[in-house]
């Protein structure tokens, strides 16, 4: 029974991990790399940032922090 719980927990964690990782890179994600690139392009052209970079950076860091937490949990589960 305990193995079933660990299996279910691993599956849930892996699903969350995949979602978070995809969110950082997907071109449809509200925290995706594409937004960082758009801010960079605007700055290179001397234009105003199209997005709030502080908020975007904080959201992206929160996702990365959660990714690390999940990876550590998965290591503990074996």
Where do the protein language model's features map onto the residues?
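A preference for well-ordered globular domain cores
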Residues: 1-78
